[in-house]
């Protein structure tokens, strides 16, 4: 009996030490406000060891997080010490401009992404004509601050300086142009972040379908609790003018495809963090209302705010 109690307490202690994933949004919008563009710090709760999912806004987002008491240190410490690397989903400025602007003040770290995205950084941004070459390849002089780590569709790897394992997925963003998603995992929990993406039906691709098939087992087991996915426009936006983005209708269309692999019950209370809203006029409130009215799966929609921590339970 004593041995049983000791073993039970040991497992209870281990379980209590299991950490949740936390997200610190540095930027949440998909345009217009250059001080609040796509960038999310993701890491194990309480460790201050993050991968930055995209890098549209960095410094302004860190400052907002400090003002919200999310971080209790200065901006430079967060930039240099807390951010262990960047995942850049694709080569558009609203997803990487903040990283580039802050590169002179940053510390040495890795950039993870698809080979196509790494090529854009080397040939279009980290060049003498556009900025300076802070990468480890490309035009001379090579400053060697950022180490390029290209990975192909569904390849798995580790995020240096964190506990996180990762897997990259290819997306379609105005076919044939590409974007990507990244799934990150602790031993007990997973999350997947999507860069910009169109719906398979509009893009005439199967990229999202392949992601849904890949992540369905972890959703069914309860390990993957959170999807971070864009909704850029309200439903009124014509489908031929979406430019590789989603509306509430198209998001729910895709989540119902996911439900075909998981069963509808597995998606009840799944966290879907809505990213990349274009904040023109009343778009944010319209998108929220449309998602609520179309939510036939019991999804828990979360609307991130710059600088305010989200804990995934």
Placement of each model-derived feature along the sequence:
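Bacterial Sec-dependent N-terminal signal peptides
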Residues: 1-21
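Catalytic core of the metallo-beta-lactamase
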Residues: 39, 43, 150-220
